[in-house]
């Protein structure tokens, strides 16, 4: 995936490079890729795509990316007081977060 996808997302004031690095990989690696206009690795691309999908789902549930990021960064009892954003590093964690968001979209408490 081209690094411009990361640049485009960081242009949104709701999302920081630090937020992306929590899911995609080390901040220094992302900074280097940005500086060199490099591509994300396949694993980084996969994690970035998962992050984008969950961010868009949460934005739909909560009415925008600012509220979505607030929710993703708030510890949830349902996740043993982990922040949902930290679960997005794995497929299983991502599915757990998506499940809660889908329930919220259908009227259950997130």
Task: Go through the PLM ranges and name each one.
Residues 1-110:
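Non-transmembrane "mature" sequence context
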């Amino acid at each position: 995936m081209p690094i411009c996808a990361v640049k485009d997302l960081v242009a949104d004031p709701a999302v920081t490079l630090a937020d992306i690095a929590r899911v995609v990989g080390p901040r220094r690696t992302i900074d280097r890729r940005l500086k060199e206009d490099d591509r994300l690795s396949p694993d980084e691309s996969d994690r970035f795509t998962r992050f984008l999908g969950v961010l868009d789902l949460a934005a739909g549930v909560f009415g925008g990316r600012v509220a979505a990021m607030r929710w993703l960064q708030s510890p949830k009892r349902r996740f043993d007081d982990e922040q949902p954003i930290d679960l997005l590093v794995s497929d299983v964690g991502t599915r757990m977060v998506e499940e809660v968001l889908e329930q919220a979209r259908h009227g259950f408490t997130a």
